[in-house]
Amino acid sequence: MAKKKSKSSNSNTIALNKKARHNYSLTDKFEGGMSLQGWEIKSIRSGKVNISDCYVHIKDREAYLLGAEISPLNAASSHVVCDPNRDRKLLLNRRELDKIIAAVERDGYSLIATAMYWKACWVKLEFYLGKGKKDHDKRSDIKDREWAVDKGRLMKNKNLDR
């Protein structure tokens, strides 16, 4: 008999930072690989990742992911020291790094991690250049969203009256 395929989700997304779009105005998108250890890959496969408060930091002309929490499994080996909050190096092209460094140093942008996902067998991090929003910016975005919903309702009702 043939084995049945297990039902797996088609999504390659590991973790999302849902508050990033709310707290920052995001401009340029970047994708980078991550330098990970074996226990981290096992934990990521089991879904023990949190990137809600993490960001990318430039140090010595290299990019590092700070604040991401990858919790070790209970069955992790005892001879390896598992630090869930360690800084993880991002693997980027020199041209991308130069562009990022210029924007961060000159223009005052921040680097915000928005998603972690699988691409083939590698873990990738999606991050954006962005600036923090003030409270009035957040309020105006909420008003714009509500107006778009109301406008859709009005147009729907207007079309039904015909």
From Swiss-Prot:
This is SsrA-binding protein. InterPro entries: SmpB, SsrA-bd_prot. Pfam families: SmpB. It comes from Colwellia psychrerythraea (strain 34H / ATCC BAA-681). Belongs to the SmpB family. HAMAP family: SmpB. Keywords: Cytoplasm, RNA-binding. One of its GO terms (cellular component) is cytosol. It is found in: Cytoplasm. Required for rescue of stalled ribosomes mediated by trans-translation. Binds to transfer-messenger RNA (tmRNA), required for stable association of tmRNA with ribosomes. tmRNA and SmpB together mimic tRNA shape, replacing the anticodon stem-loop with SmpB. tmRNA is encoded by the ssrA gene; the 2 termini fold to resemble tRNA(Ala) and it encodes a 'tag peptide', a short internal open reading frame. During trans-translation Ala-aminoacylated tmRNA acts like a tRNA, entering the A-site of stalled ribosomes, displacing the stalled mRNA. One of its GO terms (molecular function) is RNA binding. GO terms for biological process: trans-translation.
